[in-house]
Amino acid sequence: IITSISKDVSMLWPVNQSVAEVADTEENRKADISGRWGFDGEKITDLLTAEKARGMKGDEINAWRNAMEAANYTFEHNGRKWDYGKSTQTRLEPSVAAAKAGKLPEAFFWTDAENNDVPVTAEELIALSEAAEQAMFTKGMEIHIRQRTMKKELEKLTSADEILAYRVGWAQE
């Protein structure tokens, strides 16, 4: 049975200035470095409560949601695959503004998801932008619904171990 963990950080910071240094007390000897396990002198106890685990898993779900919302995806429009996502939207905005102002250069093109340069008119570019926004909205709703479902499922779990074992992601992953 492991009853203590220590880390030698003496080479990282000057003597007596390590952020890892703690007072050598009986109380400090009763918990491991993660704070999850305690030792009362006779037995090891799990200090992680279901509520703390739920908070940790909720943070993991939020991080998953943020990553999914920031990711790039593809969709079909007018027989081609196109990229969409926040970065695509950022790239499209100035070109769409130019299209709406009638200032697109001659022979303007947009590059599809398969890296083909596709000549587009102002109207086609605006339509592509609107289709990308709709695809983004649809994907955003899927992500939102999934993260809400995961959080509801999490609330039904009662033990820290069950909560920590819960898989974050799409249901089929």
Predicted regions and their residues:
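A preference for well-ordered globular domain cores
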Residues: 2-173
